[in-house]
């Protein structure tokens, strides 16, 4: 009886394996690639996420529960002192009070690039450049959100946000 049940299970397994042929063309066309969601960034409250608009002019807030838009975090048309027409990406500070807006992205090699970054204050809707001395790479907020480190010309710089955005070279 046991041998018969194992034989039946193997028989059905072999039938299902032969049901679909996988071709090299299917693999090359990524037919069996897993779908994913790109470009969403969860917010601290755990109930909302942000996503950049397709035209690169707004950062929209959406509800996880409903999937519907609940507000606009940033808009190039309404931000004060905003001289850009669109942006490429953004980075939220740990407390979500500031946003680094990435513009004028220029690729260097594979995944590395330089860009001009702007600091957007969500509370007062004001925008100002991170640095006026040239494009930056890999900016990063400090854990408390009071400083931003970035790289320019293979040197590390630090911008202290509490002290008038003073920029100092670390290396």
Roles of regions detected by a PLM:
Residues 1-23:
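Bacterial Sec-dependent N-terminal signal peptides
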